[in-house]
């Protein structure tokens, strides 16, 4: 084997090694392969590869001398395959012609003649080294118009000027000047002076560009002058137009940079000449240099004009005077130095004119007249320079700066502005919403672009601003503090409601079908369009999640940035199930968070700032997993199975918070979030295997609770951890008590059922003795408000645990009923009954009204900083103490107490009466009275929906307890009526997610005879007596209203079945809600409630079966079954009559006009339904209720009615149906006549007299049965000319006769009589002509009876057969007016109209 060369071996040794290698014939270790060109094409691709050619070094052929140090020829690009060389061209000739090597250039060099060039010797000086050049030295001798020339160029120009001046005094110049007769390029000869083109202003006194420099002295002047004369002769032979044309052609051919250089060169020479001539005028030797004007005088004159406009001294009062010798200050631009002046005084605002908002660097809103010092850095802006602070437009402009620090500063200020705006600091000082303004300006995508920045500081500030925008302060604190409330883990999604509401048929479509149908449309929409309606969806469409994962996984940011990212992810997960799924499925995002921020082992972390959160457990990361798990049972199962959360939960829960080697607060929050995550998983029946492993830990934690409760003062974080522990035990107890789900036919419902829980009853049966002492200890603090508020969540969680414990105990088939009944009796006697008798509990009931949202609807006004595209709870400023979520709120404790009492009363019937005594509390009675009273309903906002849901829980549990008590013993009449009114009000207010409560109210309280005490206290008899005493009894017989009410009470079960059929929620929603409220954990699909866009039932729900019946009849041309139609209509009318008579407050939210429209639907459903005697009696009774004197003034048909697009359209349809099928039915006719009153729209009367004249013959309702007074139709007089003409036409043609339609006949006669005898001087000519013509025709009528009625009408009187009184003789004024008109008619004839 050949050895490698070693250091020290000579070239002879290397050649010897080479000969040995060649003689051996071994294969080389490296093979040279010629690569193709970079264009991808290989010109020599057909050649075979070189196999045997090797590079051999031969020292014999090397030259003796080293090569010349000349630059090698530049690399030449190989011709591309698409460019073919000409075949007839010699390659050598082509290379020779394009050869640019130094050897080819040297052969073409012509030596420059320097014999005529003056040589100046250096100036002798007395120092050893030349003087050092300083930039600040005086350069007044330089040209003032040097522009942007370098210092070297300025020095050269100054030297040329000095040379042009000649030697100064005392300067030694050797006699080596040019020979006599030599001229320079600036000195014109006499023969070329005064050369000027004819017709041109340009004179040529000598050559300018061609100087002859470099030629021999004899030939220089001659050649330059010859070229100049040839140019002059050529220019003189051309016309001015040809010169300009040739000039434009040359300019187009030349390089623009070259043209600019020539022009600047000419202008520089001109300025140099001027300066030199001016400086040499006083005396001394000078060269006779004449100024030349260049050809393009317009370009050269511009600098001179600008120089003339510039003053010698600054006109502005600047702090310092700029010197031209300063760097880059040779040309002073005064307009750019305004910023150096002193600021003008702050303008005081004298009017209410709006001014631009300006903010400090901390995001504070500055007053318009505030005067702050300039060293604060708040005056670096152009507009309104005297005002401190920066506007939003200026901050937006700064975010696009090229300096990263400026971008970070702008984002930081904007984040501070958003935080302060959401905190409500600006109040009403700003016109409009800051968040809406920023979102409309594109701030969202500005943040998204900033996240892609390369500077870590900008990324961190952008993430901080994104958190300030998305995460409203206070929202997470509110949801965390209420996690242990009654169903506190359930939340509404924080997403905007859909603007376009679907039809009822589309609402009944399954949610999966809707999502599939809408997803392609949403995917095709661009992110800005999505963000306009939903900020979160717009952000997710911009690949935000992968970017946040990259920041966490690659850049390793600081703790603040990590917490901001986790907070943003929590807000995204709370948006909807879809957003939570996208967060879970983002590649490596959850893996990174679990790996880096939820490790199973970590180094101890002390108190104080943490340098890094990586490899340290983070409570916020645990909370993110908990929020994700709350979105659905499938997400929870994936989290538990795919990310090894079992070991992490065991690691954190197994140790007490003080033993976790973390800061105390962080350890408490981490332990609390771990318990909550486990509780959420247990809400789906998952995570039961952890209970067996951590059973000793949980028992030890429960045993320590009494000691922690005795701490003074109690620590809030510890109380939250204890409440979370009790909530976890509550869910585990429910899981142990739940039985395996039965077989379900529906596959969708079967998917909700899981395997039986791994927790058994024997494993949780020992928890109650440990929890009950904790409850007893906390109840002792009830009389101490401060301590009670501190331990607030603990007694709530204890009560909820006891309720779940007894519920699960009673469901165990192996347990003895006597055991749990005796234990309930013991708990009631020892704990609950003494609690109910405490005065402090009464104070909690009294504070319900002060903390209620229903009793204080103005307390939930939507916040100003609440853009519809970005939903938040709006708890930035914290909840007031006397509010539902405040520290003094009695709702969580009383709701948990009522839940426990309901559980005990349902299991132990003997305790029901004793426990129901709590309902007699005066505070609860007053609270119910105020909730039932009519008033403005709270505006439905995200916070009001959250708060009202908890308030409705308390109301429902109180009503459920009252229903259980009423089933055993009669309730007091006043209490029963109050509870029934409360149930009716609650039924129309329940929000989505409470479908089970709606169903239970329909089953129990609403249609129970126990809550209608009027049926046994003389209610029907009182109704009959009221009919007899009613002033309107002479008009509409009420058909025995008392009898109808008594019959309705007997038919109450049928009425309940009817409403259960038509008002029950969808089956899937009902089952999901039922599983949540019953504790059937295996069927719970999600802890995320449906969107609270509106209540489950409309305000007019008593008419809902009738409305659906009307829609079914409209969609079914063949008609509906008479049996179903008759039964549904009767039950609805009976129930509405009960409400109108005994619970009128339940229908106060339904306007009388809407009730009238619903009654019309009875006649529109079928052509025979209204003929049935029961329906006739019920409709007549309800019509009489609408026509009562206290209700009739509120009947307004001109306003917009709920559920109705247009009442005139409904009335036109009603007239069509009346004309077709009524056959003169009096009740039908009464409903037709009711909207024709004078105070209603004239459109309704025009519809009858203009389009349905044939219906007049069927309106045979007698005057005595008219439901309202006749004066409602005749007063005030009609002023619509078209309707008056229709009245007169129907009277004259006989279409309207007193025996066919007595009511409208009297109405038409009254209005026509009032019109023809009206003498209003302000009437138009058209009205006067119509009045005169109508009176003339009336006087000439052949029908004497009609003529007598129209002329002698006096007053309406429904007791007379005609319906009005007549004058026996016309009044004198009318008689005189009629005689004057008739005399004119006899003379001129009757005018035609």
UniProtKB/Swiss-Prot annotation:
Transmembrane segments: none
Places the protein is found: Nucleus
Primary location group: nucleus
Compositionally biased residues, Basic and acidic residues: 518-531
An annotated GO cellular component: DNA-directed RNA polymerase complex
Cited Pfam families: RPAP1_C, RPAP1_N
Record-linked PANTHER family: RNA POLYMERASE II-ASSOCIATED PROTEIN 1
Assembly mode: Part of an RNA polymerase II complex that contains POLR2A, POLR2B, POLR2C, POLR2D, POLR2E, POLR2F, POLR2G, POLR2H, POLR2I, POLR2J, POLR2K, POLR2L, RPAP1, FCP1 plus the general transcription factors TFIIB and TFIIF.
Name of the protein this chain belongs to: RNA polymerase II-associated protein 1
Organism: Homo sapiens (Human)
UniProt lineage: Eukaryota, Metazoa, Chordata, Craniata, Vertebrata
